[in-house]
Amino acid sequence: AKCIGCRACTAACPTGAAAVAAGGRIQVDRAACRSCFACVRACCSGALSRIGEELDARTLVERVMAQHMSWRAEGGVTLSGGEPLAQPDFAAELLQRFREEGVGTALETCGYVPFEAFQKAAPFCQLIFFDLKCMASEVHRRYTGVDNRRILDNLMALSREFPDLPLQVRTPLIPGVNDGREQLSEIVQFLRRLPSLADYELLPYHNWGEGKYRQLGRSYPLAGLEPP
């Protein structure tokens, strides 16, 4: 509704990702977009805007701590994502600063990062939520695009190197993908070898991410799959 049809965004886009579609509507080709935000800077009407902002760890902690008095007594901070350990130095600094403030800390991870990332962040965590989708590497590759060897190695190494750090392992149950009795039994057998396993949680499938795929112009690979 804010677009005035000036087409400044299409002129500013270096890759041609922003283009005029049928009916004169501006459409962004997500595959061609480099997220340079030249179109946003050129938009004088505010029809295009950037979501999010870059902050250093100190500023972010200050903003969070400004709300600290409204937390419940058991409140704390959990780093989630995306994958927070994709920025291991930033994640470690955030966690350390929160611990220095006396705030409880936790971290959610898919585990597909260099183990050095865990070594940086784990000393400042009080709990880690670790996703383990399946044990079969071919199934994991088919549905996520990557092998799970690194994930399994990281989970075992993390539990052994930080035996006092509780691990809560979680498996999102996808009907027809990883919800078979044999598949779950393989996971349980592996988890029994972890020194610091605190809990194992099965998460029922949901399709809350379908709208995000639509906004990104991508097809949802599990379209038609109904939650239990």
Regions found by a protein language model. Name each.
Residues 214-223:
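Short glycine/proline- and charge-enriched loop/turn segments
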Residues 1, 193, 225-228:
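Short, intrinsically disordered, charge-balanced linker/junction segments flanking boundaries
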Residues 8-28, 38-53:
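Iron-sulfur cluster-binding cysteine motifs and their immediate structural context
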Residues 58-208, 214-215:
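Conserved AdoMet/S-adenosylmethionine-binding subsite of the radical SAM
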Residues 24, 32, 53-59, 63:
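FAD-binding FR-type
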Residues 25, 49-52, 83, 143, ...:
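Pocket-edge positions in alpha/beta enzyme catalytic cores
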